[in-house]
Curated annotation (Swiss-Prot):
Natural source organism: Lactococcus lactis subsp. cremoris (strain MG1363)
Binding site for Zn(2+) 2: 171, 174, 197, 200
Signal peptide span: none
Cofactor(s) this protein cannot do without: Zn(2+)
Name the UniProt record assigns to this protein: Chaperone protein DnaJ
Length: 379
């Protein structure tokens, strides 16, 4: 399997740091951007660069790619990341892609591995929440109130799971160990194994009278609200960790974390690539031929731009510092203005005569057979 192709697309070594990968991505992205490079195949190259960076910029995906190639990066060899679910979801209990081996041994030996103290504190599950941002909100940052459901300690029993006035007792069957010994006949002979206690289900505690609110779980679902300060310059797919805002822990363990994933809406005016912003500017062919000073919209407000005479479609001009804020760094990126010359469709008589006079002065025959046409002059 080829697990170096993504590095080759960006032109970096397999041991490159994240800063080196990001720098190379910016360079290659500009090189093949469809608005800046009109060569055949440039758009495909641009997509390949995007695909490579999406994987190599994520440490989990990169590790999977380094080990298994493209199949690993796409999730073909076990879990990683957040999946594609919107809203929120739990993260606990993931076992990767090799659970089958464990299942085989469990069928013989009752679930091997090191024994875990059932009464040990355990951190609660992590949650995920997706925030939709407008284009400008992602550029300048914003505060959002996020409301979601999470598991908190039961307000009635305080997390014990027992009815008020009672308390959990040590399990009578396993003696608080959470495991019981079982003798089994296996293909290897009669063997004594350990398995999870069927009374306390591994907790080591037995609740005689369950709490009427949480029914013995010690947790209850509660609507929870948290303020999220979205930093300026975030992009789709980036995530933010809010410590302690996930589900409640077990046996006094800490709360899990909330991971906020950003989804940025597209702009009907601008395109964005990291801190760089692109704007396609329609321009009359007379302005392009004679040159002009025009107003250009940016996310920071309109600015004036001088267009030199003879400007062609596809020409681009850089407005330094008029891009998006750099999330990891200082200052802003740049805005690139890509010129798109518009040919008039409906002209009045005066306009037609003016163009015919121009054609005559240029020695161009615009009609008739076998003679140069107006646009042949530029071929």
């Amino acid at each position: 399997m080829n697990n170096t192709e993504y590095y080759e697309r960006l032109g970096v070594d397999k041991n490159a740091s994240q800063d080196e990968i990001k720098k190379a991505y910016r360079k290659m992205s500009k090189k093949y951007h469809p608005d800046l490079n009109k060569e055949e195949g440039a758009e495909d190259k641009y997509k390949e660069v995007q695909e490579a960076y999406e994987t190599l910029s994520d440490e989990q995906k990169r590790a999977a790619y380094d080990q298994y190639g493209e199949a690993g990066a796409n999730g073909g060899f076990g879990g990683g990341g957040f999946g594609g679910a919107s809203g929120f979801s739990g993260f606990g209990g993931a076992s990767g892609g090799f659970g089958g081996f464990e299942d085989i041994f469990s069928s013989f030996f009752g679930g091997g591995g090191a024994q875990v103290n059932p009464n040990a504190p355990r951190q609660g599950d992590d949650l995920q929440y997706r925030i939709n941002l407008k284009f400008e909100e992602a550029i300048f940052g914003v505060e959002k109130q996020v409301k979601y459901n999470r598991e908190e300690l039961c307000h009635t029993c305080g997390g014990s799971g027992a009815k008020a006035g009672t308390h959990p007792e040590t399990c009578h069957k396993c003696g608080g160990r959470g495991q019981i010994n079982v003798v089994r006949d296996t293909p290897l002979g009669r063997m004594q194994t350990q398995t999870t206690c069927d009374v306390c289900h591994g907790t080591g505690k037995e609740i005689k009278e369950k709490c009427t609110t949480c029914h013995g779980s010690g947790h209850e679902k509660v609507a929870h609200t948290v303020k999220v300060t979205v930093p300026a310059g975030v992009e789709t797919g980036q995530k933010m960790r809010l410590q302690g805002q996930g589900d409640a822990g077990v046996n006094g363990g800490p709360y899990g974390d909330l991971y906020v994933v950003f989804q940025v809406e597209a702009s009907d005016k601008f395109e964005r690539d990291g801190a760089e912003i692109y704007y396609k500017m329609p321009m009359d062919f007379v302005q392009a031929a004679l040159g002009d000073e025009v107003e250009v919209p940016t996310v920071h407000g309109n600015v004036k731009l001088k267009i030199p005479a003879g400007t062609q479609t596809g020409a681009n001009f850089r407005l330094k510092g008029k891009g998006a804020p750099k999330l990891r760094g200082s200052g802003n990126g740049d805005q690139y203005v890509i010129i798109n010359i518009v040919t008039p469709k409906n002209m009045n008589q005066a306009q037609k005569e003016a163009l015919q006079a121009f054609a005559k002065a240029s020695g161009i025959e615009v009609s008739g057979s076998g003679k140069k046409g107006f646009f042949d002059k530029f071929k």
